[in-house]
Amino acid sequence: MSEEGDLEKIILKHALINAIKHGGKAQVGAVIPKVLGEYPELRARAKEIAEKAAKIVESVNLMPKEKQEETLKKEFPEVRLEQERKEEQKKLPSLPEVESFKIVVTRFAPNPDFVIHLGNARPAILSHEYARIYKGKFILRFEDTDPRIKTPLAEAYSQIREDLNWLGIRWDEEYIQSLRVPIYYKVARELIMKGGAFVDDTSKENYEEMLSRGEVHPNREKAPEYNLELFEKMLSGHYGEGEAVLRVKTDLSYSDKSLVDWVAFRIIDTDRYPHPIVGSRYIVWPTYNFASAVDDYLMGVTHIIRGKEHLQNTIKQKHLYEHLGWRQPVAIHLGRLRLEEFIMSKSQIKKILKESGGAYSGPEDPRFGTIRGLRERGITAEAIREVILTVGAKQSDASISFANLAAENRKIIDPISPRLMFVENPVELIIENGDGSCIETKIPYHPEKSEIGIRELKICSGDRILISKADYDNALSLKGGELRLMELGNYRIDGLKAILVSKDLSYAREKGLSIVQWVLKENSRHAVLFMPEGETLITKSGTIEDTEKLKEYVGKNVQLVRVGFAILKSFSPLVTLIFSHE
């Protein structure tokens, strides 16, 4: 680059990009490294560039945000095109057969036997997003018709609602299947009378033997009236648990016998296995495939987004729709989604909680891949949504690294997280400023957001500060025993004294000194940082600065200087934090 105008133009480009990324306000300190990174040969002119950048950034910050975006698009179309290309990559593909429906209706249908995890959140987010894109309707439906095997938990209904709300998911209608059982009975009677179902009153073993011999149950060929009478007997309590089921007639030629004449209703002893909502009111319960298919039709669902483990269920449900003359919704099957190094299996988490003896706090433990666990760890709903939309609606299995999730989260929380000083395993040092003088310093809570505030500190000779033992030992291991106390000065460590050598930052840079965080002892609180690593929860004890704002940050993301991002969980009686990521 040789022309003066070219230099100003490249500074303008990075000033505009930085401003648009940060709410319309660019920072000189962020623009200069971008310019020098793109043109390393300009490093010798760093002072000149800094002066020009200050003026250009000032003019950019005076522009309305719309003007900034307009200027970037006009002057630097390649930058805008690159942004649009990245947005296009995250755009969801169109739903199939949309034009054949008056309105797009999607649903999320969890079993309330536990809280939801990242894998469950995928169909919820995608279904909600598609309904939003097509200005359609989104339904939340609790599928809780198995009080024996997949027993619903009374607390799970509200927990799932809370998790969905936190994720930014709002639903237009809500249904609970256990409150709709009479509707399923009505449809079952209709199905029987259309010749689409029969009552199997043999044992499971006898039925499987018949199938293996190529035979069918005698009731399959009986009149609808006969099977309806048997079904009414099921409802009246004539049969006990396991003595009779209602089966949907299917193609008998399937090699996979689980698809043949699948079970639509079974008897459950609800005196032994009461339902958390309806207790023992019903003993005949619809299976997942029956209740789900019926509700999808009655609720007008047009597109079902669910895991590919439901591929066979789509085949099963096809026969029910054909018997009743209903149109089957379009099914989109997703591959499994895994979050590397996290436990996501419901059954495994339940087992751990049962057997751990209190070592885990519950479904919200930050070592779990539950939505509550990720939230507890400081992962934002926006970051979860972003990675889900990036993965999209693919049938292939996908694995998300925590590093990728953390990268998305960092983009969201870095611009808003206050910086706090945390010192692990602290060593106490006495300050000596040479002539007994004091040093006044102003330390911003955020390097680019002055509105977040600053701390004003006055450090005098005789004051006691705390630094980490690791930083203390590192300084002593170096020739000269020097380090720089962040935003304060350069000090030589002599035993338990910190003796001022110089205030200039350039001195520290020339000598390659470590720039370390510190806490004024009289303005400190004991703190514990919990760091999840796989199935382990490491505890780090230390000291955190007791600023006037600390209490305000409870429940919020913060950045511990030179440690990483964390979420502040409690202020009193003890400051506790959970590590999020670097």
Residue positions per predicted region:
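C-terminal accessory/binding modules appended to enzymatic or scaffolding proteins
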Residues: 38, 101, 437-582
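Proteolytic maturation boundary segments
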Residues: 51-59, 63-96, 436-467, 512-515, ...
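Residue-level signal for inorganic ion chemistry
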Residues: 127, 160, 191, 296, ...
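Structured alpha-helical segments in the cores of large, soluble enzyme domains
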Residues: 122-132, 156-157, 161-164, 280, ...
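Extended, domain-scale alpha-helical bundle/helix-rich regions
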Residues: 19, 23-39, 43-46, 363-455
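Active-site cores that bind ATP or allylic diphosphates and position pyrophosphate for catalysis
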Residues: 190, 194-350, 359-360, 370, ...
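N-terminal Rossmann-like or analogous alpha/beta NTP/dinucleotide-binding catalytic cores
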Residues: 2-28, 34-219, 309-343, 352-357
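Glycine- and acidic
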Residues: 106-113, 139-146, 297-305, 365-371, ...
